[in-house]
Amino acid sequence: MARKALIVKQQKPQKYKTREYNRCKICGRPHAYLRKFGMCRICFRKYAHQGMIPGVKKASW
């Protein structure tokens, strides 16, 4: 879990546009962010296995 202080700090408007970055909407993780789903890879995997993301299923070939 991300520290609460870092999440709050990131939500403030930044002085420069390049300082803005995405965080997972669920856990606040800043790395491995999937833009299409708005969450990190770990949360994506957890929610996909639970079937909570519509249209996503485990690949098999």
Curated annotation (Swiss-Prot):
Needed cofactors: Zn(2+)
A Pfam family hit: Ribosomal_S14
Domain of life: Bacteria
A Gene Ontology BP annotation from the UniProt entry: translation
Annotated positions binding Zn(2+): 24, 27, 40, 43
Cofactor mode of binding and number, as noted: Binds 1 zinc ion per subunit.
Keyword tags: Metal-binding, Ribonucleoprotein, Ribosomal protein, RNA-binding, rRNA-binding, Zinc
InterPro entries: Ribosomal_uS14, Ribosomal_uS14_bact, Ribosomal_uS14_CS, Ribosomal_uS14_sf
Record GO terms (molecular function): rRNA binding; structural constituent of ribosome; zinc ion binding
Coiled coil among keywords: no
GO cellular component, one term: cytoplasm
Family under the similarity heading: Belongs to the universal ribosomal protein uS14 family. Zinc-binding uS14 subfamily.
SUBUNIT field: Part of the 30S ribosomal subunit. Contacts proteins S3 and S10.
Function: Binds 16S rRNA, required for the assembly of 30S particles and may also be responsible for determining the conformation of the 16S rRNA at the A site.
PANTHER family: 30S RIBOSOMAL PROTEIN S14, SMALL RIBOSOMAL SUBUNIT PROTEIN US14M
Protein name: Small ribosomal subunit protein uS14
Species of origin: Thermoanaerobacter pseudethanolicus (strain ATCC 33223 / 39E)
